[in-house]
């Protein structure tokens, strides 16, 4: 055997071994993560928040929505079971119906989108399915929207769930995106509107309040302004992933926040999940966002 052949053979063995080790590490990570969830107390609440980018035709045709929906269904069947799954950009009724009908044995409850939209606008895309009973308390559409967001009915939904005799309030929202123009001031008006219409009416309540969704806020200073305004708390992220967008910028845009006064949460673990490992596919074949979980 020549030196060149020997080196090629050695390189092949090295690549094969590194691939096996990498897959074993990923599998071990998910086994440990699932075991951690099983160990959680029964009265804890498990939440998954995911921007799934499911547009109605004709826009959805360009993003392989049907194939991506099937991948999302498969991953949610393989992953840990959650009490509540909150979706953003679930604009397509056909896709929502497909996902719900495929998962209703695991998640028998849903609250479909209930927006007052104009004929030329999309709905809010804010949808929820759950393994426990869930009730819609209130919802509204933002007054201020800019650029392409003006063609949607973005807003916020307030839900109630009860687990082990403990009630929780959960807000699902999707705020203004940035385009060539940065729209931080629009997002400020939007979370102020959330405070006025959904948070303040429940200010004196002893019910724990959680805010989830795609906030489109990547700068820590801007997030801190929102947290201070609403009296909410963020927390550290477990795991290796520290961003939720799959774009070139790798930004953290999606959050699970909790009310910081009156209500004291014993603990909450946040983790950004690469769900593609369940199917051995590229993450973009699911969505352009990673989901974030809170337990």
Describe the predicted segments one by one.
Residues 2-102, 118-122, 288:
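N-terminal, active-site-proximal structural segment of metallo-dependent hydrolase catalytic domains
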Residues 19-37, 199-210, 216-295:
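Metal-dependent phosphoester-hydrolase catalytic domains
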Residues 28-38, 84, 88-175, 269-274:
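Structured beta-strand-rich core segments of catalytic domains in phosphoester-bond hydrolases
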Residues 42, 121, 149-153, 247-249, ...:
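A generic structural micro-feature
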Residues 45-52, 72-99, 129, 159-160, ...:
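Active-site beta-strand/loop signature of hydrolases that rely on acidic residues for catalysis
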Residues 54-57, 92-95, 121, 177-180, ...:
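Active-site environment of divalent metal-dependent phosphoester hydrolases
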Residues 56-61, 141-149, 175-187:
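Surface-exposed cleft-lining segments at the edges of enzyme active sites
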Residues 63-67, 182-199:
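Alpha-helical scaffold elements lining the catalytic groove of polysaccharide deacetylases
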